Amino acid sequence: MGIEIQTKPFGKMQVSERQILSFPEGLLGFEEYKKFALIEEEEESVFKWLQSTEEVDLAFVVIPPSLFKKEYKPLIPEQELLGIGINEIKESLTLVIVTVPGEDPSMMTANTQGPILINKETLIGKQFISRNESHSVREKIFESAAVEIG
């Protein structure tokens, strides 16, 4: 059964209940927004949208970090992972927020220091802070990439 939401990139659309994610603590800087829909831009695209179901103007472009950083391993204490009901990062859907500068999309960056982990069973997510010092809030995707962005 679908739920109708208003989105920033696509206007009004139907999403399935399995696309609605709960973030009990919100996202960093947006703690008041707790529900987001994970929307695929196009089937063949690596990009997805994390769209607030509570605020139409709040949407983030996200991708799995493994697409441009094969050995991506955020360092997050196990006790924090238990907060979303997982024991290991590999049990989650891992995404990072992408910033695409309008003037030069080839300069897009990803926040590898603030990964979003989602429990695939419960659909509860959280944005964590990776303790891995090699991660950055503005990692250039194309410099790290072994990806072909469609």
From Swiss-Prot:
Recorded source organism is Leptospira interrogans serogroup Icterohaemorrhagiae serovar copenhageni (strain Fiocruz L1-130)
Q: What is this protein called?
A: Flagellar assembly factor FliW
Where is it localised?
Cytoplasm
Q: InterPro entries annotated for this entry?
A: Flagellar_assembly_factor_FliW, Flagellar_assmbl_FliW_dom_sf
Keyword check for Chaperone, yes or no: yes
Q: Name one Pfam family in it.
A: FliW
- Classification lineage: Bacteria, Pseudomonadati, Spirochaetota, Spirochaetia, Leptospirales
Q: Which HAMAP family match?
A: FliW
Q: Name one GO cellular component term.
A: cytoplasm
Q: How does it assemble?
A: Interacts with translational regulator CsrA and flagellin(s).
Give the function comment from the record: Acts as an anti-CsrA protein, binds CsrA and prevents it from repressing translation of its target genes, one of which is flagellin. Binds to flagellin and participates in the assembly of the flagellum.
Could you tell me the keywords of this UniProt record? Bacterial flagellum biogenesis, Chaperone, Cytoplasm, Translation regulation
Q: What is its main location?
A: cytoplasm
Keyword Signal in annotation: no
A single Gene Ontology biological process assigned to it is:
regulation of translation
| Family assignment from sequence similarity | Belongs to the FliW family.
